[in-house]
């Protein structure tokens, strides 16, 4: 998202659950700048981030004893998702590193496609993500040029609370 160039401008851009996956904070800021440049005047950028502190599973990964146990083992394959062609798809995820000082994590993803009991495709890759809190993202949006910025919790009309799992930002160009 940090390097896209599109031939026109948009009234709305929505980043759903993927902000912070550009690989670095610099690239994340560049993503916001690109979004700003691809919006019409008075256009809106909407994006959501997880409130890490609402999940004990996520928050505990910041503790030394949990970081020292990384990388996490691959989870069991679990149930397949069956596609319309009958093929079965498996996805596995694991955390291999969390850096509380840099507010970042590294996750590995393993995907498999099976057809008639045979593995026909597989891929494995690594994602580096950044963890953001409300005020840091507000500042980044201002630096990117946005003027009116509101924050809501869990896709409601009200302001966020400390118990809501998602923060939803609306930033106007």
Predicted features, each with a name:
Residues 15-19, 48:
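Residues lining the SAM
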Residues 4-13:
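A short acidic, Gly/Pro-enriched loop at the edge of an enzyme's catalytic core
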Residues 20-24:
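A short His-aromatic
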Residues 13, 62-66, 167-169:
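Short, hinge-like loop/turn segments at secondary-structure boundaries
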Residues 123-173:
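C-terminal lobe and adjacent flexible extensions of AdoMet/dcAdoMet transferase-like proteins
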Residues 45-46, 148:
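A short hydrophobic/small-residue beta-strand
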Residues 28-44:
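A short glycine-rich, Lys/Arg-flanked "PGG" loop and its adjoining helix->strand segment in the class I
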Residues 49-136:
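SAM-dependent methyltransferase
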């Amino acid at each position: 998202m940090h390097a896209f160039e599109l031939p026109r401008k948009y009234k709305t851009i929505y980043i759903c659950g993927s902000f912070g996956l550009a690989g670095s904070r610099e690239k994340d800021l560049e993503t916001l700048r690109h979004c700003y440049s691809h919006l019409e005047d008075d256009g809106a950028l909407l994006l959501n981030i997880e409130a890490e502190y609402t999940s004990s599973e996520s928050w505990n990964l910041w503790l030394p004893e949990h970081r020292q146990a990384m990388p996490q083992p691959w989870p069991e394959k679990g149930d397949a998702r069956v596609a319309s062609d009958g093929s079965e798809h498996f996805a596995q995820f694991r955390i291999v590193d969390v850096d509380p000082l840099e507010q970042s994590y590294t996750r590995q993803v393993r995907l498999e496609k099976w057809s008639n009991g045979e593995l026909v495709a597989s891929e494995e890759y690594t994602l580096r993500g950044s963890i953001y809190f409300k005020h840091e993202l507000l500042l980044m949006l201002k630096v990117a040029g946005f003027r009116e910025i509101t924050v809501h919790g869990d896709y409601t009309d009200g302001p966020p609370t400390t118990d809501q799992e998602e923060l939803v930002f609306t930033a106007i160009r």
